[in-house]
Amino acid sequence: MPAKGPLQSVQVFGRKKTATAVAHCKRGNGLIKVNGRPLETIEPATLQYKLLEPVLLLGKERFAGVDIRVRVKGGGHVAQVYAIRQSISKALVAYYQKYVDEASKKEIKDILIQYDRTLLVADPRRCESKKFGGPGARARYQKSYR
């Protein structure tokens, strides 16, 4: 077996609420898989365009030289989709910064941020905790005077 050069790979994560997606990006031929399945098979089908946004924005040629494998867990369907798209975007930016050049990384970053900032920056909002005196965070139990 011939000796290969050092493996060019980066590992980044994307988060939304309690969903966490970890993306491994390495030199390859344009594969993007989520939990071992291609992007096109991810449910719900209505959110597939959200997953494909980074690819559609940047064009397939930028993804042609890399393979991205994503593991996602936690959260609901929508939160997982947002975590996946963020991890894919961050993985490509990190790969270009480390192994390609700074100019193309900046170009990719500018395109993504101009379209939607959450593609690269996590949404800090979290669920507010429940308090006593009511069924939820802000709602109070009904009060009766008679």
Curated annotation (Swiss-Prot):
It holds the Pfam family Ribosomal_S9. One of its GO terms (molecular function) is RNA binding. The gene is rps16. The keyword Cytoplasm applies. Keywords: Cytoplasm, Ribonucleoprotein, Ribosomal protein. It is found in: Cytoplasm. Belongs to the universal ribosomal protein uS9 family. It comes from the Eukaryota. Component of the small ribosomal subunit. The ribosome is a large ribonucleoprotein complex responsible for the synthesis of proteins in the cell. One of its GO terms (biological process) is maturation of SSU-rRNA from tricistronic rRNA transcript (SSU-rRNA, 5.8S rRNA, LSU-rRNA). One of its GO terms (cellular component) is cytosolic small ribosomal subunit. Component of the small ribosomal subunit. This is Small ribosomal subunit protein uS9. It comes from Ictalurus punctatus (Channel catfish). Its main location: cytoplasm.
